[in-house]
Amino acid sequence: MASLIYRQLLTNSYSVDLHDEIEQIGSEKTQNVTVNPGPFAQTRYAPVNWGHGEINDSTTVEPILDGPYQPTTFTPPIDYWILINSNTNGVVYESTNNSDFWTAVVAVEPHVNPVDRQYTVFGENKQFNVRNDSDKWKFLEMFRSSSQNEFYNRRTLTSHTKLVGILKYGGRIWTFHGETPRATTDSSNTANLNDISIIVHSEFYIIPRSQESKCNEYINNGLPPIQNTRNVVPLSLSSRSIQYKRAQVNEDITISKTSLWKEMQYNSDIIIRFKFGNSIVKLGGLGYKWSEISFKAANYQYNYLRDGEQVTAHTTCSVNGVNNFSYNGGSLPTDFSVSRYEVIKENSYVYVDYWDDSKAFRNMVYVRSLAANLNSVKCTGGSYNFSLPVGAWPVMNGGAVSLHFAGVTLSTQFTDFVSLNSLRFRFSLTVDEPSFSILRTRTVNLYGLPAANPNNGNEYYEISGRFSLISLVPTNDDYQTPIMNSVTVRQDLERQLTDLREEFNSLSQEIAMSQLIDLALLPLDMFSMFSGIKSTIDLTKSMATSVMKKFRKSKLATSISEMTNSLSDAASSASRSVSIRSNISTISNLTNVSNDVSNVTNSLNDISTQTSTISKKLRLREMITQTEGMSFDDISAAVLKTKIDMSTQIGKNTLPDIVTEASEKFIPKRSYRILKDDEVMEINTEGKVFAYKIDTLNEVPFDVNKFAELVTNSPVISAIIDFKTLKNLNDNYGITRIEALNLIKSNPNVLRNFINQNNPIIRNRIEQLILQCKL
């Protein structure tokens, strides 16, 4: 029977090729490596607390005293004081709008008697009479309102700081006058304030009007001492100008930089290619029924050109929020039906995880300001033929949805060997023409994209667009930040096993019971068990070796060597002892033997606490004394074989773990029985024991002494149809003594007859056992 595979594994699991041992030792070898951090490192170890480095925010901090700037000609901004630091006599500045405002300020040194001096203002030679009888400098504001008029002295500033100010604000020109340290402001009217420009002949500063009190302080008391050192060098005014630059489609921009970290903005155009994955599962039987048509994640790798450079990209497409439909053509075995098929519609989402080999994805750990803009794409379904044995084939055809970009987040893609930090693009859906239908059925004019043929023969769907993100990366491009989701080979294997476990568990509903019992009666060996995997004979042999190497460490294999001694010890304990014996390593844990049969009920409470150990011992006992009846391991092995054949993810690396886990975890709730004359003694893993008569199925007291004696001499039988199911079957349908005996012995032919008759009680029991075959 099918459980032969487990007995073969128990027998051969200790024979392992030397090559496999050497390979295992090599993979487990470790080596200490000392890395020279280089001359610029301050420590050999990575920082315990990773800092974010310099952070740019949206707040602009405007300096109070901006400058000094070199002499120049420009149009001063409105609301800003121009503070001019005069260092010699002569013209300090000239300002005009060439319409109604001309003014020039000339500096006169202390102790100057009245004298006529020549000045060049606005390209003209002018003679002004000046005088200064104070100890401070005088700044004469010469003004005219027309190019035809002569200049006259409108205001005078007497200053020891040699600072002059001019401001454009409120439709007027403001300047300082009076004597420091009590100089004040005054203004002049003009009809054209915006066009007023200035020619500055000395170093100057720029101060916002919001800081006018500071400007007043500087005029009256002088600049801060630091501004009067030789280390302050005036710059060109052009250095103050902000260069507004729009980011290009494909550009890497350094935003900020510190000694260890820098912020990089990556702007890239991308081409996203993806395809849908699907799974179509056909039910067993005559071939007219399908179990499931569903979407599944699909990977796609491709190359494309970006600005003349070839890019290697990897995408994973998955769906969320699917809608479940079904079609049932009738109750007859030859009526076409689909138990469940998935359709994506307006309430669904499509996720596409994208990665490429550009620098943007190299250190994608600390990311902000993530944005994207993508085009839409229409996905149209194709045709799928339901190949029936006889008659015209139904055809699922059509269906369409349009994908619209709805957001982007960070994600992780898993390949066979590595994990990739990726961008997950989320798409919302709208249904589109054409509708889909199943030809030759009543299913017509439905909208959405069914999972039967979502790619419609296309290798991929394509979306173009661009994304932008700011990533915190090491300043030295030779370093990489630790990828939080990077995995070792073993961790990746765990991920594969997790996916495979989920797939295995989901396949339980797709196993046909009639085929399962037929498969359970076959003598499955290594080759037939693994032949469902697409591989060569050599690979199957290698798989068998790998399975045996893994299986020898299983709980089942390590328990087999102790079984015989345990059973012998249990028998002697039951026959000799009149007091409680507790030995965890032996089957004496079965009972608390008592000479007083009336105390059997009390002893059952102790039995219930030890059934986990009991079931393991009885399982091993059953495997050695196999009867003609079907066992739990026959069903377990048959389900394992069926799921291996159905699985799309099974492989050489995952098969050993799956087979070993199946031997330990499939059907955890088991019942075993021992048959003696017309009495049956049964025990299950839930802590319950039963003793009953075959003829009437009426319970009798459970004799622990008798059970302990029989367990070493009588065959142990898997209670495929347990006592509760037998009782239910007899109460509702009535069964003969022969039928009851065959069900107690787990006769496969009788089980098959009940299932073929669609007996709901037997069918439900077998279905529950299949559903217990989970990892």
Curated annotation (Swiss-Prot):
Pfam families: Rota_VP4_MID, VP4_haemagglut, VP4_helical
InterPro entries from the UniProt entry: ConA-like_dom_sf, Rota_A_VP4, Rota_VP4_MID, Rota_VP4_MID_sf, VP4_concanavalin-like, VP4_helical
Short motif YGL motif, span: 447-449
Site (Cleavage): R230, N231, R240, S241, R246, A247
One of the record's GO cellular component terms: membrane
Record keywords, A-Z: Capsid protein, Coiled coil, Disulfide bond, Hemagglutinin, Host cell membrane, Host cytoplasm, Host cytoskeleton, Host endoplasmic reticulum, Host membrane, Host-virus interaction, Membrane, Outer capsid protein, Viral attachment to host cell, Viral penetration into host cytoplasm, Viral penetration via permeabilization of host membrane, Virion, Virus entry into host cell
Entry-linked SUPFAM superfamilies: Concanavalin A-like lectins/glucanases, VP4 membrane interaction domain
Region (Hydrophobic): 388-408
Coiled coil: 483-510
Motif (KID motif): 643-645
Gene Ontology annotations of biological process type: permeabilization of host organelle membrane involved in viral entry into host cell; virion attachment to host cell
Stretches the record annotates as Spike body and stalk (antigen domain): 247-478
Segments carrying motif DGE motif: 307-309
Region feature (Spike head): 65-223
Residue numbers spanned by region Spike foot: 509-775
S-S bridge residues: C317-C379
Additional detail: This strain probably does not use sialic acid to attach to the host cell. In group A rotaviruses, VP4 defines the P serotype.
Family named by the database record: Belongs to the rotavirus VP4 family.
Protein name listed in UniProt: Outer capsid protein VP4
Organism, as annotated: Rotavirus A (isolate RVA/Human/United States/WI61/1983/G9P1A[8]) (RV-A)
Lineage start: Viruses, Riboviria, Orthornavirae, Duplornaviricota, Resentoviricetes
